[in-house]
Amino acid sequence: MTPHQTLDFDSCYRAASARDMRFDGRFYTAVTSTGIYCRPICPARTPARRNVRFYRHAAAAEAAGFRPCRRCRPELSPGDPGWDVAADLVGRALRLIDDGVADEYGVAGLAQRLHVTERHLLRLFTARLGAGPLAVARTRRLLLAKQLLTETALPITDVAFAAGFGSVRQFNATMKEAYGFAPSELRTSNGPLAAARRAPAPRAAGHAAPETRHSAGPAADRDAQSTRPGDAQGARPGDAQDARLGDAQGVRLATAAEPPAALTLRLNHRAPYDAATLLGFLAARAIPGMEEASPSGYRRAVTGGSITLTPADGHVKLSVTLDDTRHLAKIVSRCRRLLDLDADPVAIADALGATTLRALVATRPGLRVPGAFDGFELAVRAVVGQQVSVAGARTLLGRIVARAGTPARPTPPGGGIARPTPPTDATERSTPPTDMTTRSTPPADATQWSTPSAGGAGADGPFLLFPTAERLAEADLSGLGLTGRRVATLKALAEKTAAGELDLDAGADPAETAARLMEIPGIGPWTTGYIVMRALRDPDAWPDGDLGLRRAMRALDIAEDDVERWRPWRAYAAMHLWSSE
């Protein structure tokens, strides 16, 4: 099922009846007799066919008057990977909405980023999703708020701003109008304290209550709700105000006397999930002072705090500490892309498993392509990593961050701004220069966080941010071990990005970005392919000319012609080949 296909009722009903995990996030099941919508994997009894409607996107279900199920929790659905394969304008727009562009700049700003008119964007969204971009952004805010209310004890004020609302009043009114209950009511019945109260009363064996789909939760979720009128986008009165967030009044920012907000969220994914290989990849490339990784998890500094990502049963646990919760929505979106949580491993394995990669696919089920937390950061990593080892690139990047990076918080724990001591040139020269993509990862039995001798992380974890394009364009990069040509390439990359001539964000057009990258002296097909693969999330990107890929293909007796047979999953084929070494 691709985003361009019309939903077939019989196919969707069979998938929902079987609770087929492969369709989670690809469509939603709405029930007219209850007025709520579910994921295809909802564990309750399948409703009668006459009462069922299917929608491509949660926003379309909400625009038709349905509320999210409190049992299967649609806010936990992984994203639809079909949009990455299609690589079209709607998919790029969805990624920008996830990053909060519509919240901050409205639909006009979103359309401007995509170089189309608002009318054209609305027409595409309505045709493909059944709801306009404004409605999609609104649903994203509501579902994130629902997850925060259910999983955390974050104050409702902080929940409002973390989800992207401009005020608590707006948050209360929108949730009441869309879902039929106030935020405080949801927390009372479904929040962490309510769950704790319910936990000590298990039902005796043989006395389980019968399940009926959509019957969980209070009466508000059991009563049918009539379809609410909306405009062509499925938007509601007041959505225009929701679409732009100025300086939110009443937002609480952490101060030196008040610790930053700490919370934990579930990030669901489709099984299987090869966390070990992905974390090993990130650990080998962890930049000193900015990030740390081990086989048990990953953490890094972010604006106003830090994040920790830990694999768990069926999901990844995201632990966040932030000065300002308004950054949370973008962080969640970027973490999902970094860990490739929206991929469909079964579909990828079915396609690649029918080729010469059959043995590799069977060896590493659920292999993911590591993404990027920031597009510009990934581009710099790729340029610095040209013709040097992974360890050498990591050393050079650590020096760049130590010189040009900024603290995640104005005053880190302990006072002052302690920067990592850049390694000596001898450290870099001790590692033989080979292709960066072919280096081995840390041993599987390692259990400690990767903490380079360069320092900078300390007991409180990483606290330096990667320099922005504007900052790197002005930074002095001499004396760091970079060649003059490499410095010139980095400066040109930073200047073009800072000037808006080069878009490296998730919503960029891969083909257009690749063409602009190739215009920069010092950036060739390998660097471009690597950036498009990881920063722009193109599942068919191929780092042409990579020595490690050639070596692996020769060792496995795979012909060059086979590369074309791996479409549209060549990025995953590359990861399988790199991992085979």
Mark where each language-model region is:
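HhH-family (HhH-GPD) DNA N-glycosylase catalytic core used in base-excision repair
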Residues: M1-D223, P229, R244-L245, Q249-E581
